[in-house]
C-alpha cells in the first residue's frame, strides 16, 4: 500500500467506524507511534575526551524511556487482529528500529536499570523482525473475501532492519552480553531462561530474513542487501555465537539447557538452508574457478543449440527454398532449409503450447554465500558432526516422541533436513578422504558420527511421518519431500556401512537392511511416491527419482546375497471388510433379541481386537517380481517428466538415475511397450536432435543407446502389427502394453459373442499326453517346455524356476537345521531309543514332517492368466508336482450358497495351485535342473509337440432330480416308493449299498446312548438277519473271496455276463466292472 507523506492533524474528526478501513487506522496510530518514538531519546554531540575539541555522536535515552517502550508494546498488540499490520507499518515509517538498536547498544552495560531497558528493546526488536509466513497469512485471510495486503513492503522493511542491525558488531555483542550472565548460572530460573530465549530468538529472526536477489552487476544497496546472510554468519563467528550453538547442542540432554534445543534446531536449519553439501565440501579457493568453468560450459552448450538453428539476423547469403506437396506450395527463407528436414522447419513455425511453470523448490531457498562464510561453515559443520550431532538429534527425537508443548509441526521438517544434510556431508567428506589418503584415513570420520538417525526407532518414526504426510488430505508435500530426502541419505549411509572395513558397521548394516526390507510398506512407498507425481516442485521430482533409484539398487544388491527373502505384507482389507459387515449383521440380529445390558459382557468389548488395525502376513519375496511392479504407465510418465529437463541437469548423476530406472523397465521387465506413445516418441526425438549438447558421460551414451533400442522395438512391432500406430495414441493400462499390437482374431467368434461365455462356463482346458506314446517324465517335460518356449512365454518358465528355487531353499534350510547335514555318520536315536536310519540324500522323517505346503501366488496379470487359462503351462505345473484342490461342492459350505457364489468359488479353486508338503528337495532340484538345461539348450522335436497332446475328458456331472413335496415323508425323512424315479439295476444296487451302510452307521451313532430296550432288541435282530443273508449269498456265489483277501476272478458264460447277477452286500457299490 502507498503510505501518506504527512499525517493529518490530530484534531481531525474521525469517521464513525474509523477502525474498519486501513487508511483510517493509519490516521489514528501513526501520530501516536511517532510521538512515542520521539520520546525515546535522541542523538547529541559530545566532546570526547573533554577539552580535546573532538566530538562524537552519542545516543541519550529519554528520562521515561522504559515507560515509552512499554507503551509501544501495547500499541504493537493492536496488530493481532489487523491483517494489514498497520502499527508495524507506522513503526517502520517512524524509524523505530534505529532507536531500538541504539538503546540496546547504549543501555546493555548500564547496570540493572540499563539491562531492563535493553531487554524491553530486544523484545520489540524480536517482534519487528519476527518471520512472516506469507503463504500461511494468505491462507488465513482467504475466507474473508477480496483482501489486498501489501506483504512486499513488510518484507522490505525487515530486510532494512537486518541491514541496520549488521552495520556494526555492537548490537549482536550487546545481546550476547545480556545472555552470558544467565548462561553462567548453574541453576537457571524462569527469568534467566526467558532472557536466553529472547536473545536466541533475535538471532533466529535475523537468520530467517532472506537476502535480496541481485544480478551479478548490481551495485550499491542492491549488492549490499544480497550478501547480508554472509555478513551475519561472519559476525556470529567473530562474536563466538557459533561456539555458543555448539555448546547448547552438545548439552541438549542436560536439564538446564534442554529447553533451548528447539530454538537451536531452528537456528541451525536457517544457517544451512539452501546450502548444498557438495558445495560446502569443495575447496573454497577453487570455487571461483569452478564457477567460471560452469559458466563457460553453459555458454558453449547454448552456442551449440543456437548453431543447429542456424538463423542469423544479418546474413551475407540469402536463401529461399520452395517445398511443393500434392496440394500446396511452401516457401522457406532459412539457410538451414538446405540441409534440414523441411517438415521439421515447418514444425518450428507452429505455435508453441504454453507450458505451466513449475516451482523449483518448496523446501529450501536460494542463497549465495561468500567464500569467507563458506569457510566458516565448513569448520562449524565438521565440529558439529564430531561433537554434538548424535546428542542433539537424540534430545529432539525424545521431545517429539513425548509430544512436548515446545515442539511444532514444522520441527519435523527441520530434523529431516538437518539429518539428510549432515549424512550427505559426512559421506562426501569420507569420499574425499578416501581419494586423498586411502581407507586408513576414513577412521578420522567414522560413520557412527550420525548413527542416531539410523537407529531403527528413528527410521520407524521417519517412515511413520512419511505415511502420515502421504495420507493427509491434502498431502503435506514439503514435509514429504524432506522425509524422502532423509530416507534416501539413510539408505546411502547403510550402503556405505555394508562396504566398510569395520566388521561392526557391516553387521549393523546387515541387520538394518533386513528390518527395512522385511517391512513391505517401505518398499511399496517407493513405488507410490513415483507413481503419484503430478505437478509438484522440481526438487520434489528429483527427490523421488533419487529415492527410487537408491532403494532399487540396494535391494537388488541385498537380494543377490540371500537365497530367499520374506516380507511382512499388509493383508487385503476387502475380505476383512466383508467379515466386519457380517459381524455387524450378527450384532444387529443380537440386538433384536433385546438382551438386557446387565447380562452383557463389557470386558469382552474392552479386550476385543481393533477392527481398524491392519493385519499382516508373511510372504516370500523376489526382487524380480518387485522390479516388475515399476513397469507402470504412471511411473513412466514421472520418468519422462524428469527426462524432459535433460538440458537443465546439473552433472551426470541425474541422467544416470533416470536412465537406470528406465533400463529396469525396458530391459529387465521387458516393458518397452509402455514407451510406445506419440508423446514419448516426441521427447525421444528432441533428445536425439540435441544429443550433441549432452555431457560427455557414460550416462548420456546409455540414454542414446536405450532410446535407439526402444525405437527399434517400436518400428519392428509396427511392421508386424500396423495397428500399433493407433495404439500409440492412447494410454497403456496395466497389462495392455503386452498386447500393444491390437485385437486378436478371437474377438469375432462367429457365435454372437457366446464363445467366451461358453469357455468361461466350461472352465480351463485340461490337456494330457496321448497314452500310446508312453513318454517318460523328461520327454513329457521337454514337450511342455517346447510349446511354452515356442509361444514366447519364456518369462513364465523363469518365474516358475524362481519359485521352485525359493521352495528348495526353504526345505533345505529345514533339513540342515533338523538333520544337521544329509549324510551324517553320527549315531542318533529317536524318542523310543532306536537308532535313526537315514538313507543317503533323503531327509529324515522328522525333517519331512516339518515341510509345509507352498501356495503358488502369482502377482502379475500374465502369471495369473497363465495359471488360470493356459493349458500348456498348467500341464507343466502338474509335471512339476503342483496340484489343485478339489472343486468345492454345495455340501462344503456351512450355509446355503447361490449358484453364482459356487461358480466363483470353483473358479478360484481352478487357479489355487500348491506344491504338496511331501515333495522332497531332491525332486524339486531335479525339476529345476531340467528346466535350466532346457533354457540353455531348448529341445528340438521331430513332430509337432501340440499333436502329442489331447484334451482331457471332463468328468460329467449328473444332477439328481429333487423329490417333490408329495413324495417326501416328513416323519421318517424318506421318499415314498410310489413317487421314486425309475433307475436301472446297477443304480439300484449302488444306492442300496449306500443306504445299507448309512442305515447301519446311523443306527449305531444315534442309538448309542439310547436306553430304550425295545429299540436295542430290534437293532440286534436286524443285524442277525443281515448276517444270515450274507452267508446265503456267499454260499450261492461260490466263495468270491479267497483266504488271502484277494478277489477271485469270475468266470464267463458265453463271453458275457457274470456268474452272479447280485453281488454280496459286502461288495455292493465297489463292483464297477459288471
From Swiss-Prot:
One of its GO terms (cellular component) is replication fork protection complex. Residues 572-595, 936-1074 are annotated as: Disordered. GO terms for biological process: DNA repair; DNA replication checkpoint signaling; meiotic cell cycle; replication fork arrest. InterPro entries: Timeless, Timeless_N. Residues 948-962, 978-991, 1046-1055 have a biased composition (Basic residues). It comes from the Eukaryota. Keywords: Cell cycle, DNA damage, DNA repair, DNA replication inhibitor, Meiosis, Nucleus. GO terms for molecular function: DNA binding. Residues 1014-1031 have a biased composition (Basic and acidic residues). It is found in: Nucleus. Belongs to the timeless family. Involved in chromosome segregation during meiosis and DNA damage repair. This is Topoisomerase 1-associated factor 1. It comes from Cryptococcus neoformans var. neoformans serotype D (strain B-3501A).
Amino acid at each position: 500500500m502507498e503510505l501518506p507523506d504527512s499525517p493529518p492533524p490530530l484534531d481531525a474528526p474521525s469517521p464513525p467506524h474509523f477502525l474498519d478501513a486501513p487508511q483510517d487506522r493509519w490516521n489514528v496510530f501513526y501520530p501516536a507511534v511517532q510521538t512515542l518514538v520521539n520520546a525515546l531519546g535522541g542523538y547529541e554531540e559530545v566532546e570526547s575526551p573533554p577539552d580535546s575539541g573532538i566530538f562524537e555522536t552519542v545516543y541519550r535515552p529519554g528520562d521515561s524511556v522504559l515507560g515509552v517502550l512499554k507503551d509501544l508494546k501495547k500499541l504493537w498488540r493492536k496488530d493481532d487482529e489487523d491483517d494489514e499490520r498497520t502499527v508495524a507499518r507506522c513503526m517502520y515509517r517512524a524509524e523505530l528500529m534505529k532507536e531500538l538498536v541504539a538503546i540496546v547498544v547504549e543501555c546493555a552495560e548500564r547496570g540493572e536499570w540499563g539491562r531492563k531497558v535493553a531487554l524491553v528493546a530486544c523484545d520489540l526488536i524480536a517482534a519487528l523482525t519476527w518471520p512472516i509466513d506469507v503463504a500461511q497469512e494468505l491462507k488465513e485471510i482467504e475466507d474473508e473475501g477480496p483482501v489486498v495486503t501489501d506483504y512486499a513492503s513488510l518484507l522490505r522493511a525487515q530486510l532494512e532492519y537486518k541491514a541496520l542491525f549488521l552495520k556494526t558488531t555492537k548490537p549482536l555483542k550487546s545481546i550476547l552480553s545480556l545472555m552470558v550472565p544467565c548462561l553462567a548460572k548453574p541453576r537457571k530460573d524462569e527469568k534467566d531462561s526467558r532472557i536466553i530465549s529472547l536473545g536466541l530468538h533475535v538471532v533466529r529472526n535475523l537468520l530467517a530474513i532472506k537476502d535480496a536477489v541481485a544480478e551479478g552487476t548490481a551495485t550499491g544497496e542492491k549488492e549490499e542487501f544480497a550478501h547480508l546472510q554472509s555478513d551475519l554468519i561472519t559476525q556470529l563467528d567473530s562474536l563466538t555465537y557459533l561456539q555458543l550453538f555448539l555448546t547448547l547442542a552438545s548439552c541438549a540432554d542436560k536439564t538446564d539447557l534442554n529447553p533451548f534445543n528447539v530454538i537451536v534446531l531452528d537456528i541451525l536449519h536457517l544457517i544451512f538452508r539452501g546450502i548444498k553439501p557438495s558445495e560446502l565440501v569443495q575447496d573454497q579457493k577453487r570455487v571461483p574457478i569452478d564457477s567460471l568453468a560452469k559458466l563457460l560450459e553453459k555458454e558453449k552448450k547454448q552456442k551449440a543449440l543456437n548453431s543447429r538453428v542456424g538463423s542469423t539476423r544479418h546474413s551475407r547469403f540469402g536463401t529461399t527454398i520452395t517445398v511443393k506437396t500434392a496440394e500446396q506450395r511452401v516457401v522457406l527463407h532459412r539457410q538451414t532449409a538446405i540441409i534440414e528436414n523441411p517438415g521439421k522447419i515447418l514444425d518450428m513455425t507452429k505455435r508453441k503450447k504454453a507450458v505451466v511453470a513449475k516451482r523449483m523448490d518448496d523446501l529450501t531457498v536460494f542463497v549465495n554465500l561468500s567464500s569467507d562464510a563458506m569457510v566458516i561453515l565448513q569448520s562449524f559443520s565438521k565440529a558439529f558432526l564430531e561433537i554434538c550431532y548424535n546428542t542433539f538429534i537424540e534430545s529432539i527425537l525424545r521431545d517429539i516422541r513425548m509430544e512436548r508443548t515446545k515442539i511444532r509441526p514444522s520441527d519435523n521438517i527441520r530434523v529431516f533436513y538437518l539429518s539428510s544434510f549432515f549424512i550427505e556431508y559426512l559421506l562426501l567428506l569420507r569420499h574425499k578422504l578416501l581419494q586423498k589418503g586411502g581407507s586408513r584415513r576414513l577412521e578420522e570420520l567414522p560413520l557412527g558420527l550420525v548413527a542416531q538417525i539410523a537407529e531403527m526407532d528413528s527410521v520407524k518414526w521417519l517412515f511413520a511421518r512419511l505415511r502420515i504426510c502421504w495420507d493427509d488430505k491434502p498431502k503435506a508435500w514439503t514435509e514429504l519431500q524432506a522425509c524422502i530426502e532423509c530416507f534416501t541419505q539413510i539408505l546411502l549411509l547403510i550402503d556405505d556401512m555394508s562396504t566398510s572395513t569395520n566388521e561392526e558397521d557391516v553387521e549393523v548394516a546387515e541387520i538394518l537392511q533386513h528390518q527395512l526390507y522385511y517391512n513391505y510398506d517401505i518398499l511399496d512407498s517407493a513405488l507410490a511416491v513415483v507413481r503419484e507425481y503430478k505437478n509438484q516442485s522440481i526438487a520434489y521430482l528429483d527427490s523421488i527419482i533419487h529415492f527410487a533409484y537408491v532403494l532399487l539398487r540396494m535391494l537388488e544388491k541385498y537380494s543377490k546375497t540371500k537365497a530367499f527373502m520374506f516380507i511382512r505384507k499388509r493383508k487385503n482389507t476387502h475380505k476383512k471388510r466383508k467379515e466386519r459387515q457380517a459381524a455387524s449383521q450378527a450384532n444387529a440380529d443380537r440386538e433384536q433379541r433385546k438382551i438386557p445390558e446387565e447380562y452383557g459382557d463389557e470386558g469382552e468389548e474392552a479386550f476385543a481386537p481393533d477392527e481398524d488395525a491392519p493385519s499382516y502376513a508373511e510372504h516370500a519375496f523376489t526382487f524380480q517380481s518387485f522390479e516388475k511392479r515399476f513397469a507402470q504407465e504412471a511411473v513412466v510418465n514421472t520418468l519422462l517428466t524428469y527426462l524432459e529437463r535433460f538440458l537443465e541437469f546439473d552433472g551426470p548423476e541425474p541422467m544416470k538415475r533416470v536412465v537406470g530406472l528406465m533400463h529396469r523397465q525396458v530391459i529387465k521387465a521387458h516393458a518397452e511397450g509402455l514407451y510406445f506413445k506419440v508423446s514419448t516418441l516426441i521427447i525421444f526425438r528432441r533428445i536425439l536432435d540435441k544429443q550433441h549438447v549432452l555431457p560427455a558421460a557414460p550416462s548420456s551414451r546409455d540414454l542414446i543407446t536405450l532410446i535407439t533400442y526402444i525405437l527399434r522395438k517400436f518400428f519392428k512391432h509396427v511392421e508386424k502389427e500396423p495397428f500399433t500406430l493407433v495404439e500409440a495414441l492412447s494410454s497403456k493400462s496395466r497389462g495392455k502394453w503386452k498386447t500393444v499390437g491390437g485385437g486378436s482374431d478371437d474377438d469375432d467368434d462367429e457365435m454372437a459373442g457366446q464363445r467366451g461365455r461358453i469357455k468361461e462356463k466350461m472352465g480351463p482346458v485340461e490337456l494330457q499326453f496321448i497314452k500310446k506314446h508312453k513318454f517318460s517324465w523328461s520327454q513329457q517335460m521337454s514337450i511342455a517346455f517346447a510349446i511354452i518356449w515356442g509361444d514366447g512365454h519364456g518369462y513364465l518358465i523363469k518365474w516358475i524356476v524362481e519359485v521352485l528355487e525359493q521352495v528348495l531353499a526353504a526345505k533345505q534350510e529345514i533339513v540342515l537345521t533338523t538333520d544337521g547335514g544329509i549324510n551324517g555318520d553320527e549315531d542318533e536315536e529317536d524318542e523310543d531309543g532306536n537308532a535313526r536310519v537315514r538313507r543317503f540324500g533323503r531327509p529324515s522323517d522328522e525333517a519331512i514332517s516339518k515341510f509345509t505346503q507352498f501356495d503358488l501366488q502369482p502377482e502379475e496379470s500374465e502369471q495369473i492368466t497363465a495359471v488360470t487359462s493356459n493349458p500348456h503351462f498348467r500341464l507343466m505345473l502338474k509335471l512339476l508336482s503342483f496340484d489343485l484342490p478339489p472343486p468345492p461342492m454345495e455340501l462344503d459350505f456351512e450355509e446355503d450358497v447361490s449358484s453364482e457364489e459356487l461358480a466363483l468359488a470353483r473358479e478360484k479353486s481352478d487357479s489355487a495351485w500348491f506344491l504338496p508338503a511331501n515333495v522332497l528337495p531332491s525332486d524339486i532340484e531335479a525339476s529345476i535342473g531340467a528346466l535350466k538345461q532346457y533354457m540353455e539348450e531348448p529341445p528340438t522335436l521331430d513332430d509337432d509337440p501340440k499333436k502329442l497332446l489331447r484334451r482331457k475328458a471332463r468328468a460329467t456331472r449328473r444332477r439328481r432330480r429333487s423329490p417333490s413335496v408329495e413324495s417326501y415323508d416328513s416323519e421318517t425323512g424318506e421318499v415314498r416308493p410310489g413317487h421314486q424315479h425309475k433307475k436301472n439295476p446297477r443304480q439300484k444296487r449302488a444306492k442300496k449299498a449306500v443306504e445299507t451302510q448309512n442305515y447301519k452307521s446311523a443306527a449305531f451313532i444315534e442309538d448309542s446312548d439310547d436306553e430304550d430296550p425295545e429299540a436295542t432288541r430290534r437293532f440286534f435282530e436286524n443285524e442277525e438277519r443281515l448276517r444270515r443273508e450274507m452267508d446265503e449269498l456267499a454260499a450261492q456265489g461260490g466263495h468270491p473271496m479267497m483266504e488271502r483277501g484277494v478277489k477271485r476272478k469270475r468266470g464267463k458264460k458265453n463271453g458275457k455276463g457274470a456268474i452272479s447277477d447280485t453281488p454280496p452286500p459286502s461288495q455292493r457299490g465297489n463292483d464297477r466292472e459288471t
